[in-house]
Amino acid sequence: MAIFVNEVSRTFGEYLLIPGLTTRQCTPQNVSLTTPLVRFARSQEPRISLNIPFVSAIMQSVSNDTLAIELARNGGLSFIYGSQPIAEQAEMVRRVKKFKAGFVSSDSNIRPDATLRDVLALRARMGHSTIGVTEDGSPNGRLLGIVTSRDYRIGTTPEDALVKDFMTPFSKLKVGRLGISLKEANNIIWEHKLNTLPIIDENDNLVYLVFRKDYDAHKDNPVELSNKATKELLVGAGINTRDYAERVPALIEAGADVLCIDSSDGYSEWQYDTLRWIREKYGDKVLVGAGNVVDEEGFRYLAEAGADFIKVGIGGGSICITREQKGIGRGQATAIIDVAQARDKYFEETGIYVPICSDGGLVHDYHMTLAIAMGADFLMMGRYFARFDESPTRKLKIGNNIVKEYWGEGSNRAQNWQRYDSGGSEALKFEEGVDSYVPYAGKLKDNLAQTLGKMKATMCSCGAITLPELQQKAKITLVSSTSIVEGGAHDVILKDRG
């Protein structure tokens, strides 16, 4: 006979936090948002911790290399989407790793026998005024010089003038050698009043550029998520349960720091087999998350299979219609509460802490703090990040509104790839996601600062300055529909903000 769970399945919108004692120590500047990303044993430290509890969703319309770089610079982590050819996904991972937190791989390069006309065309296309002149015009060719806007005058320098005749030649350049630290590179820039410092290898091949303008940008990102030894930004990548034997090695070779199996329903033998294959081939060297699940059984199944973190949530995403199409899922708040208890129980029994990620169901910023208070270690978000300049989709004007495209991995547009199947050979015949728009919001950094500011303020109101302390001290109450209305502006005529 079927098992009936009589507990009501609830969402974040049905709860509020009750204030706790705010001590003098509880100020936003004292709040730490550090949280574990992957499993660790009692009394040990996790191999990777996030500096903010946010990761971006494994989606075509969200997580490419551009967003991954910006999110890592602000303390979070992106999982590059896997619904693309293996080589293209691996190349996105490489581009993030090459960024190296202040060291920029040059994507505007030219040959010495090109003309000023070519320089102007390249500048118009790429938007960069600093162009590396290499022997073969490639990003990592032998460096012969640099061209900037100070090397020519439009209207005076002939457009057919050869680059080699007006560039700043290698002999007059200040350069840094590969292996130099960012601090050392910045010291050279400031000492010699440079705007750009090329970094070259032992054969004089161009490897990176370091820009003066990035010095302040780097200072503005004190929570940057990077490898302390190499200074490379951290990045994740999504995998599936079909081509993992080919995809995983390519992503590891490209430098991915952590992987995640991407599926709407992770409680399956297909995920178990994928996890076991990775463990048998790589041992514990490769970090990999799994999911999604919504109860203790699903959590324990994946934890025992070797998952380094587990995603929680089925059907709660803004573009996900799995519940509508298949009738499976669970209210996100109830799922998090249940799985968090399962995680803590597993930790007591085994001494192994397996972090959980809340994926979906976050409508308002305060829902993020609620999800953490209920037990989530970190949050995966798609719609939130899709709104920003750095997401890979087009910015459009529809009527009087500026929007960005946003579609689910279960939509026809994402071609379903290998995500929403059951692991067999039969192709999926229906959608589990929609194609939509989200309001354009501007730059990631600006919006993230506001969101994190709200989270820190809420934590202080609860008397907590760390995420574990919030989970210990939080008092959470169910609210009625009328009290939700009471919590907003009511019984007044609002002024037009336009």
Summary of predicted features, one role per range:
Residues F79-Q84, N109-I110, T130-T134, V175-R177, ...:
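Catalytic beta/alpha-barrel core
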Residues R47-S56, G102-D107, F170, K228-G238, ...:
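Short beta-strand/loop segments at the ligand-binding rim of alpha/beta enzyme cores
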Residues T66-I69, Y244-A254, V288, V293-V312, ...:
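Catalytic cores of alpha/beta
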Residues T27-L50, A57-M59, E88-H128, V133-D136, ...:
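Bateman/CBS regulatory modules and CBS-like beta-alpha motifs in cytosolic regions of diverse proteins
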Residues R73-E88, A256-S268, D308-K326, L362-L396:
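Glycine-rich phosphate-binding active-site loops on the catalytic face of alpha/beta enzymes
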Residues M1-L21, S108-R111, G176-R177, K183-N187, ...:
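Alpha/beta catalytic cores of nucleotide-metabolism and tRNA/nucleoside-modifying enzymes
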Residues Q84-R94, N140, G155-D160, S181-K183, ...:
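Active-site-adjacent beta->alpha loops and helix N-cap segments on the catalytic face
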